[in-house]
Amino acid sequence: MEFTTAGLCDQFHGTHPLQIVEPLFRPFGAVSRFHGRITTLKVFEDSVLIRETLAQEVDGRVLVIDGGASHRCALLGGNLARLAADNGWQGIIVYGCVRDSVELGTVPIGIRALHTHPLDSHKRGGGDRDCLITFASVNFRTDHYLYADEDGIVVSEEKLI
């Protein structure tokens, strides 16, 4: 279904508890507009849990990763983005960095991240899944809904479209 975040704000702001993500994120990935139910991860400079999560087949979910805003390595690259797209993920939000930005632009998935960084992350296996995470003035919870387009990112407790 077609939507715009501006349209969602016009229609639902004031009647639904919308949260609007601060405009910190750059677009990556071949899809500019995406939405779905949220799955949350909290990791720091480690992508093992990200890979495990994206390897699971889902029906149109969006992975929201709190990477602590680290600018010392990338949490997501071309291989993980392709894995996500192949398994039904609609989008990935990374509060941190990505790499392989040219390749990401060819993968049929929506991606938002703070920046790029050429160094890959550690592979130690730490992190938490399905926990409350907070960044960019928004509380992200598993099973809430995220809507992203060229204008921004909106989060709602309820399905809007």
From Swiss-Prot:
Cofactor(s) needed: a divalent metal cation
EC number: 4.1.3.17, 4.1.1.112
Protein name, UniProt field: Putative 4-hydroxy-4-methyl-2-oxoglutarate aldolase
GO biological process: regulation of RNA metabolic process
Catalyzed chemical reaction(s): 4-hydroxy-4-methyl-2-oxoglutarate = 2 pyruvate; oxaloacetate + H(+) = pyruvate + CO2
Quaternary state and interactors: Homotrimer.
Entries under Pfam families matching the protein: RraA-like
Gene3D superfamilies, alphabetized: Ribonuclease E inhibitor RraA/RraA-like
Domain of life: Bacteria
Function statement: Catalyzes the aldol cleavage of 4-hydroxy-4-methyl-2-oxoglutarate (HMG) into 2 molecules of pyruvate. Also contains a secondary oxaloacetate (OAA) decarboxylase activity due to the common pyruvate enolate transition state formed following C-C bond cleavage in the retro-aldol and decarboxylation reactions.
Residues bound to a divalent metal cation: D100
Cofactor note text: Divalent metal cation.
InterPro entries xrefs: RraA, RraA/RraA-like, RraA/RraA-like_sf
CDD domains: RraA_family
Binding-site residues for substrate, renumbered to this chain: G77, G78, N79, L80, R99
Top enzyme category: lyase
Molecular function, one GO term: ribonuclease inhibitor activity
UniProt KW keywords: Lyase, Metal-binding
